[in-house]
Every structure is written in C-alpha cells, then in structure tokens.
Amino acid sequence: MIAIPCMDTMPTLFVSSLVLMDKMPETEMAFAVSSLIYDARNTIAASALRNNFDRLLWIDSDMKFDRDMMKRMAQRMDEGYRFVTGVYCMRKPPYAPVLYKAFEPGIDPMPFSKGELDPGKGMIQIAGCGFGAVMMDVSILSEMKNQRSDYPFSPFLGLGEDLSFCKRATEMGVKLYCDTSIRLGHVGLQEFRL
C-alpha cells in the first residue's frame, strides 16, 4: 500500500512523481487528510493492519522522487530489510539531511553529514529519519500494537511523529536503514536537494 498523509493540497511536483512512479502489481493507495499528520499516519497504519497489507510505502505529499523508487525500496525489502528510507534534506537552511545517527526527546537530533551519505555507501543503519519516503514491513506495526498501548505515530514530547515512531521501533529491536543511492527532492516554494 502507498500511504500518503496530507493536510489539504498537494504540489504538482509530488503529483507528477506519484503518477509517473513504477508501481508494483496490485498496489493500492491510501490518502488520509488531517491537519494533524500523526493522526493521518495512525489512521493509515490501522487500515494497513486491518486489511492485512504486507508493506507500506509512506510518501509525504511534499516529496519529489524518481519513478523507480518504489521498486528499488521493494528490492531492499526482498533482501531482508524491514525498514528502508532514502536521502532527502530539510526545506530550510542549512538543508540538513532528515536522517539521524542519534536523537532523544528534548535534545536536537544528530543528523548525518552530507559526506556520510554518499550514494556509493549503499545501505547504512540509522537511528531515525523523517517519513518523507519510507518503505516498511507492516509486521513492525503489528509488533508495536502487541507491545505498546499507545498509537505508533503519537508524538513524544520534543519529537515529531516520525522520530517518535523510530524511537518506538528501535526500542523494540527493529533496525532502520537508509539506501543512500535513493535520492529525493523536498518540495517547498522550490525543490530542495542535497
């Protein structure tokens, strides 16, 4: 399932990427509209569990990506990875990568440097990431539901919903990875890219 949480409108660069994307056979899409992104993510997560999907591809509505992104992430999942993201940056200076070596609630996360994310590095383990483009095994949500009483994307104090999810997942022993060869643009008034 392709999971797209959004607030209201979607930039043309995102829509064109989505339309042109090489989709896997029988792929469904779920849009959840909410002014609270964590609520939209929790709604889609519950639907994925209820409908017995195997994988979720989260794509934020402000991302621009290559048409083969889904297939490349699926290939990594087929290799045994349960959580895969790509490389993109924040939309404001200093345009830091939205990939973290370490983070704790209330403390600024420690991002990877651009040099550490060279496309030739391939797969690297991360502590957390933004959810602009993440493919994950739905079994992670199932395990989380069985081990915790809170919603998977409910934000911890001092963390967004994406890093809060990553914290929950890593506390359960889930390993998170970034494929540094998968590059995305983050769309604002212009496209931002590393």
Language model regions located:
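Residue-level recognition of beta-strand->loop/alpha-helix junctions
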Residues: A30-V33, V87, T180
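Conserved catalytic core of nucleotide-sugar-dependent glycosyltransferases
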Residues: A45, D66-S154
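Active-site nucleotide-sugar/metal-binding loop of Leloir-type enzymes
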Residues: N42-R55
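Catalytic donor-sugar/metal-binding loop of nucleotide-sugar-dependent glycosyltransferases
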Residues: S149-L159, L163-H186, E191-R193
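Short beta-strand-to-loop acidic/aromatic patch adjacent to the donor-nucleotide binding site
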Residues: F53-K64
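N-proximal low-complexity "stem/linker" segments adjacent to membrane-targeting elements
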Residues: M1-D39
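Short, Asp-centered acidic motifs that coordinate Mg2+ and/or phosphate
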Residues: R55, Y81-F83, L176
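Anion (oxyanion) recognition and catalysis
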Residues: K23, D78, T170
